[in-house]
C-alpha cells in the first residue's frame, strides 16, 4: 500500500514539474507564441543590421515563431508595406525619402526615430589625401569615384548635379554596396588616391580614417541636410500585432551602437550570426525594446 501511494505521489510530483516547465516555456513567448512577422531588407547596411537584429530578438527573446526578412528594393518597399505584403520597413531616411513616404502615408504608420543622431552622406576620400573639397578633387591623382547601386538617390545626384557643377573628371563607377566596399578596402590598404560614396551611420566610418569633401556649391542639395532614420509599418499592425509594433517603436541605436552592430556583422560574415553575436554582447541596449514588447502582450 505504501509503495503504491509513494508511486502516486511521485507521479503527481512529476506531473507538477512538467506543468510548471510548460508554464515557464509558454511564459517566455507569452502573447507572441506562434506569431510571425514579415519585414524588409533593401540591402543597405544599416537596414540589414536592424532587420536581422529584430529577427534574432523577436524569435529568441520574445518568442515569435518566425520573423522573415524579405529582400526588397527602394522602388517597391513602400508600396509593399502599404498593401500589407510586408509588415515593416526599418530604414526610412527623412527628409530624403519624403516623396516615397508621401505616396503611401494614408496606409502606413511612421514609428519613432530608430537612430539617435543625424546622417551624413556625400563623396569622401581617405584622410591621407590632401583634398578637402569637391572643387579641388581634380587636382588629386584620383581617377575614380567608387559608387553604389545606380538606383540610389545619392548616385543620381552625383551624376546629374555634382559632376557637372564641379566639372569632375573622375569616372563614376556603379557597383553593389558590397562591391564598392571591397574596392575601398583594397585601395585604402594600398594607400591609393580615390574618392567614393560615403554615408553615416555605417561601419566604414569606424574602420577607415576618411574625410567627407566640402560642397561649396551645394551641388548635393537636400542631401547635404542631415536626415533622421525611422521605420514604417502597415497601418493595421498596431492592432493586429501590438507586440511587434511596440518592439520596433522602442528600438533605438546611437551612432556607436549602430556602427558596432554593423562591424560585428561584417566580421562575422553572416548577417544573422553577426546580429546574434552583437545581441549576446549588448543586452543592456536591447532589453528596453524587449521589455516594451512584453508589456504589450
Regions found by a protein language model. Name each.
Residues 44-45, 67-79, 172-183:
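Short helix-initiation/N-cap motifs at beta->coil->alpha
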Residues 106-153:
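A conserved helix-loop-strand patch within extracytoplasmic ligand-binding domains
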Residues 90-104, 186-213:
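A ligand-binding cleft/hinge motif common to bilobed small-molecule-binding domains
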Residues 23-27:
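C-terminal motif of bacterial Sec signal peptides marking the signal peptidase cleavage site
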Residues 54-63, 141-173:
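Ligand-binding cleft/hinge of the Venus flytrap
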Residues 33-46, 54, 64-70, 142-146, ...:
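Short, well-ordered beta-strand elements
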Residues 52, 57, 75-89, 178-197:
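Short helices/loops that flank or line small-molecule/ion binding pockets
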Residues 120-131, 227-241:
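A bilobed periplasmic-binding-protein/Venus flytrap-type ligand-binding module shared by bacterial periplasmic
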